[in-house]
Amino acid sequence: IGTTYFLIIFLIINNSFGQKKLIKSIQLLDSKNNNERIIFSSDEKITVVFDELNNKSRSFYYEIEHFNFNWELSKIRKSEYLDGFDNIRITNYYKSYNTLQPYIHYQFQIQNKNLQLKKSGNYKVTVTDREGRHVFSRKFIIIKNSLNGTIEISKMKDINYQNSHQKLKVNIPCNNCNFNSNTFQYKLIVFKNYNLNDFRLINRPTFKLSNSFVYDNINFTGGVEYLNFDNSNILSTNIE
């Protein structure tokens, strides 16, 4: 089982516990392949699905908020990142049939005829009921694939961490970026296995080459799959 690392560069710019227990199977899916994801390209449609353990449908609404690189609510106006309007009622739902537990399945799309996201960055979708009470929220990221960075994964040099950590070296192409600026404009965020809670935020690169930035010594903890196995002394292997 391998580990996936995802790079993102940012240009700096009521109590409802009772009903939450009834909400199950919340997922953000890419609308093309129905794969659960948290990171989407700017031209992809996102399908949000969830179930409520109930035999009667209710009115739910959703809204979208934009956040900065540090997941703090953006100071930009909604019209700057959203074309259209949100706080839209979810009208696509159906009832379960012949199930031991009755439920209502709801779904809606982000990037639809009423709502288009105009900016890349961090977002949160929030679903509320008719009274405006919070039902659930999910974070996701919209990206524009304008850079092709590379990642090198290697063992830690410190022997105390070789069996528990791994080191990453990231190279980001950037021909026209100013490394010597007092206020460096870019930040690198590396996510492990698409987990928004397991990431590294790097404010400045370690050094700059002629046409790229290099971020060195980015460390992550790893599981047993990263233990080194030396087979250099194995002379032959019999496979039956």
Report the location of each language-model feature.
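Bacterial Sec-dependent N-terminal signal peptides
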Residues: I1-K21
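Aromatic sugar-binding surface patches on proteins
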Residues: R89-I90, Y97-Q111, K208-S236
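Contiguous beta-strand segments within globular domains
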Residues: I23-H66, Y161-C174
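Short, aromatic- and glycine-rich surface loops/edge beta-strands on solvent-exposed regions
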Residues: Y62-I64, G121-T128, F220-E240
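Internal, hydrophobic beta-strand segments that form the core of beta-sheet-rich folds
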Residues: E65, K118-E131, K187-N193
